[in-house]
Regions:
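Positively charged n-region of N-terminal signal peptides that target proteins for export
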Residues: 1-4
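Conserved functional micro-motifs across diverse proteins
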Residues: 7, 20-143
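Bacterial N-terminal signal peptides
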Residues: 7-16
Length: 143
């Protein structure tokens, strides 16, 4: 009985740890992609991806907030240079949001992280992040 209780406790702890981790990685056009986190900010830099010299800032407006989705990228050996479209974020109500952040020279750096900024109504929960037709479930990351 004691082992059963310990097993249940460990399983619950493991589930809690896993739910707070990044969304599973997927390979998109020869690049391994994983969504690391979602943060809410009043101001955020609209840097290119991979991060470059773009210095424009996004600022929160009344009634809106900035949902910042951090995504990790790793260029795989089978990557072939290509233009990537701007990724989108989908809210729990199925509304799709666009970002101003754009991809520039995607394979120029072997590994990098980018922040994609989405202006959404206050309280909006994001459920999906889509890049090049590949969708990531991010609902567990949006707390």
């Amino acid at each position: 009985m004691k082992n059963l209780i310990t097993g249940v406790a460990v399983s619950g702890l493991l589930a809690a740890v896993v739910s707070g981790q990044a969304a599973a990685s997927k390979t998109v056009n020869g690049i391994q992609v994983s969504v690391a986190k979602i943060e809410r900010m009043e101001k955020a830099a609209l840097k290119d991806c991979p991060p470059g010299t773009n210095t424009v800032n996004a600022v929160q407006r009344p009634g809106d907030e900035l949902a910042v989705v951090t995504v990790n990228f790793k260029v795989m050996p089978d990557f072939k240079p290509a233009m990537f479209k701007r990724p989108t974020a989908t809210a729990a109500d199925d509304k799709v949001y666009n970002t101003s952040v754009q991809f520039v020279e995607v394979g120029s750096v072997p590994e990098y992280s980018c922040q994609f900024i989405y202006r959404v109504p206050t309280g909006t929960k994001l459920k999906a992040f889509t890049v090049e037709g590949t969708t990531f479930d991010i609902a567990a990351l949006d707390k």
